């Protein structure tokens, strides 16, 4: 033992030179040391299938990913398919019923039967889509001869009343400049724009003023000028007017409006108590600088004419 130990530790130069040969010829301890690298090689061989397994796992992933796009269109294809049947049964049918010229023609036929004879007034009533000026929930009633609420305790006048007032204001004339008091939703201003060169309209309720602008915008009416202000004051900067149409009832006609009426001009307004029980459609004609002639015509019902703005 001691001799062998002395031989190995430290090794002589010639032993070092012979060391490789001893590792091949002696299977003792050095063979065990040589087995370690072989064991290290074995995990490498074991790792290769492990490396293949992720590849085998990845291989189906593209197949699954490819299957998802194939199934994804199915729900998207079903979603549009559901509204498509509903759309033709509701929207187009309703839009056609409301916008068809035939519906407005029937309204015009009723106006003619009720005594409106001016062809220009009838054409103007037929040209303006009244359903665009009322709430969507009331659109189906737009061409009935009834007043409809537009909010803020205001209403859109009956088609028969609108046609009657405009016909009285025109009296067969061609109107150059017209003033409307009470824009409301903008419907009467739109009708007036077809029979007058320039239409000025005043609204004292700011939300209605804004709503009228929105309602008139799609129609692209170039000759209407909307103003937010007190209608009882009128619009002196644009006076005189060939005609003034007041869409609210006061106990009398404001003097400021009478002064803004051109000589030979005509003013049409409901006059009477705010309760509406004794309101009468009144025609005022200016016959001279300081002279007006008044005619009391039809029983009507309008919202009250108020001063100021809100």
UniProtKB/Swiss-Prot annotation:
This is Protein-L-isoaspartate O-methyltransferase. The active site is at 157. PROSITE patterns: PCMT. The gene is pcm. Coiled coil: none annotated. It is found in: Cytoplasm. Disulfide bonds: none annotated. It comes from Burkholderia cenocepacia (strain HI2424). Catalyzes the methyl esterification of L-isoaspartyl residues in peptides and proteins that result from spontaneous decomposition of normal L-aspartyl and L-asparaginyl residues. It plays a role in the repair and/or degradation of damaged proteins.
